[in-house]
């Protein structure tokens, strides 16, 4: 994973020369059975150098705990590894969604990261990682909470934990999806046999 990080930093430094992008790498168990993939780091994640430590991260941690899932046993990362920003009307630097170009540039690196972790289950958080791995036609509102098979991996789409902040009406659906995920993983936890490695090919 260290080589992956060094290679990614060199790639970004060359691509965004002079822009001083701060990368936030994935973290967690080296060969976690479950990999959580978000969209991109925010302000707090960039300051602390860790994924999901801001308000959305606190939501995620609370739901993981309620579902009986130990974050330290998972691997958590983002599709785009730096914070996408824009200037607000008031002149403040604020978050923005990753562009299609940013997603395209980081997709091969996400694919490589998935190969290194080699998870049995991938939980996508929000539309960005879902569309990156399943194609632009995938819609979170239609597939959330369903276990899907994508290129030999089991993929479980969920709303992004930040969505609960901006749309409280999604809280129940998010909690139900997380509880279903926790129950599903606990039911298969007795099966500790190594799963065969499968190359992951995202749909573009």
What spans do the regions from the language model cover?
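A polyanion-binding, active-site-adjacent surface
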Residues: 1-204
């Amino acid at each position: 994973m260290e080589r992956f990080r060094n290679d990614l930093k060199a790639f970004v430094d060359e691509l965004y020369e002079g822009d001083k992008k701060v990368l936030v790498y994935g973290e967690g168990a080296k060969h976690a059975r479950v990999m959580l993939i978000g969209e991109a780091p925010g302000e707090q994640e960039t300051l602390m150098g860790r994924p999901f430590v801001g308000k959305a991260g606190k939501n995620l941690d609370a739901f993981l705990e309620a579902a009986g899932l130990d974050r330290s046993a998972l691997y958590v990362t983002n599709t785009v590894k730096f914070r996408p920003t824009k200037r607000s009307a008031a002149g403040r630097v604020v978050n923005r969604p990753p562009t299609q170009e940013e997603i395209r540039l980081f997709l091969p690196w996400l694919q490589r990261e998935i190969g290194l972790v080699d998870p049995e289950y991938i939980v996508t958080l929000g539309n960005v990682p879902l569309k990156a791995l399943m194609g632009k036609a995938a819609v979170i509102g239609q597939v959330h909470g369903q276990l899907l098979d994508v290129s030999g991996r089991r993929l479980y789409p969920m709303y992004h934990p930040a969505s609960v902040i901006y749309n409280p009406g999604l809280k129940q659906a998010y909690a139900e999806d997380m509880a279903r995920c926790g129950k599903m993983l606990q039911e298969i936890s007795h099966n500790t046999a190594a799963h065969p490695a499968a190359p992951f090919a995202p749909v573009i």
